[in-house]
């Protein structure tokens, strides 16, 4: 069966050099993952514990989701439920509309991507700015992410340099990754400062405490939520874990499995709220 993804993949693979480079890059990440996992003697035990927790959570969603909602509300959050993409997009829009929001910054959210939140909000006159560097690159290129963790892994630095020259006025022909990263940081800082609302996804939602946990390497989620008075956290019900003990198992596995790191640079828990906040 032909799908949008398979058609896009077939088109991408026509460029043999790019396909080979992409394959090599992904295998480098996989090699890091394999190497780092072997540094943990109890790696397989942790995986089995995580699997058992997921099986438990998925078979007790009715209880865990209600527990999460009650605890999140007790923490001061507002909780909304959406049955499908249309309802989800409209809930977010209604929250933004109620607050008169026209500028909106977000970190990575698979739910928002799957539900096509960005084009929906843009059609309503709301500016959406992606703060994850890979997602921002793709947003400026009007492309979709190609990987759940490394969204712009198929884009070469020369392409990024040419893009930033057009969009941010960087030096022509300067493709140094550090230089380009600093240019993106400077450009995004103004977006952070003037954003009226920040959205994050969630790597985990803890039922027993009502907290959400967001893991990033760039700190963009933290930067986003530190400025605006309104924060929206959007995630699917599969993110639920029963308690902090379970959370500890997953945080030990997450970065090693995803990017071959011992831990993500930033692991932030949002529990008790100090500003007027909506949580979705």
Regions found by a protein language model. Give the residues of each.
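Conserved alpha/beta enzyme-core scaffold
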Residues: 25, 87, 91, 99, ...
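Electropositive phosphate-/nucleotide-binding environments in soluble metabolic enzymes
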Residues: 55-62, 66, 82-86, 154, ...
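Flexible, glycine/charged-enriched surface loops at secondary-structure junctions
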Residues: 78-82, 257-269
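Glycine-rich anion/phosphate-binding loop at the beta-strand->alpha-helix junction
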Residues: 206-217, 221-222, 242, 246, ...
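Internal alpha/beta scaffold segment
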Residues: 228-261
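Conserved small/polar residues in nucleotide/adenosyl-binding loops
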Residues: 271-277
């Amino acid at each position: 069966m032909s799908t949008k993804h398979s058609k896009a993949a077939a088109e991408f693979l026509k460029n043999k050099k790019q396909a080979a480079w992409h394959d090599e890059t992904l295998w480098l990440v996989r090699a890091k993952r394999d190497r780092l996992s072997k540094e943990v003697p109890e790696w397989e035990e942790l995986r089995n514990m995580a699997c058992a927790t997921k099986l438990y959570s998925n078979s007790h969603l009715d209880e865990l989701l209600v527990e999460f909602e009650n605890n999140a509300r007790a923490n001061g959050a507002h909780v909304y439920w959406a049955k499908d993409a249309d309802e989800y997009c409209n809930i977010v829009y209604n929250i933004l509309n109620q607050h008169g929001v026209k500028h909106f910054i977000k970190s990575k959210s698979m739910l928002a991507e799957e539900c096509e939140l960005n084009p929906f909000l843009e059609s309503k006159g709301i500016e959406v700015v992606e703060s994850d560097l890979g997602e921002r690159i793709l947003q400026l290129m009007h492309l979709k992410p190609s990987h759940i963790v490394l969204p712009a892994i198929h884009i070469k630095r020369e392409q990024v340099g040419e893009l930033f020259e057009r969009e941010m006025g960087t030096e022509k022909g300067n493709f140094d990754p550090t230089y380009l990263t600093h240019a993106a940081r400077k450009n995004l800082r103004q977006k952070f400062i003037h954003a009226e609302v920040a959205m994050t996804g969630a790597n985990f939602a803890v039922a027993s405490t009502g907290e959400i946990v967001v893991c990033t390497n760039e700190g963009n989620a933290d930067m986003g939520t530190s400025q605006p008075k309104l924060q929206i956290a959007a995630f699917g019900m599969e993110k639920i874990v029963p308690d902090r003990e379970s959370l500890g198992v997953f945080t030990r596995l997450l970065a090693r499995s995803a990017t071959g790191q011992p831990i993500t640079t930033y692991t932030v828990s949002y529990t008790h709220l100090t500003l007027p906040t909506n949580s979705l």
